[in-house]
Amino acid sequence: MESTAHLRFLRMSPRKISTVAELIRGKPVEAALNILKFTKRAAAKPVEKLIKSAVANATDKSKGQVDVDTLYVKTISVDQGPTQRRFMPRAMGRATPIKKKTAHVHVVLAEAKK
């Protein structure tokens, strides 16, 4: 059985989130949460929260029949979201653009074969 969770419009660069996602791809859920707990990256907190949400979705979807210890991170993908454009005033009446990037993160958890 598979369970999914999505985090959309996260106000962080997809490149920075991808480094955290690579750490936990293919790992058991318990190990992934432990890795994220001790990772000193800003992206670790929202990804940890997302995995906990996917675990809650799995238990709710199966009405409590799923064993959380058998779940692993099957896929985790980080996609680019829309960029927010802001402008910073500069000298002589000019302005330069600032691009505030967003990201979409999708997690799929699956049960390991016994």
UniProtKB/Swiss-Prot annotation:
- Keyword Ribonucleoprotein assigned to the entry: answer is yes
Give the highest taxon in the source lineage: Bacteria
Naming one, the record's GO cellular component terms include:
cytosolic large ribosomal subunit
Keywords (A to Z) from UniProt:
Ribonucleoprotein, Ribosomal protein, RNA-binding, rRNA-binding
* Family annotation (Gene3D superfamilies): Ribosomal protein L22/L17 (3.90.470.10)
Does the record's keyword annotation contain Ribonucleoprotein?
A: yes
Task: Using the record for this protein, list the coiled-coil segments as residue ranges, or answer none.
Answer: none
Which PROSITE patterns does UniProt cross-reference here? RIBOSOMAL_L22 (PS00464)
Q: Name one GO biological process term.
A: translation
Q: How does it assemble?
A: Part of the 50S ribosomal subunit.
Q: What is this protein called in UniProt?
A: Large ribosomal subunit protein uL22
Q: Which organism is it from?
A: Myxococcus xanthus (strain DK1622)
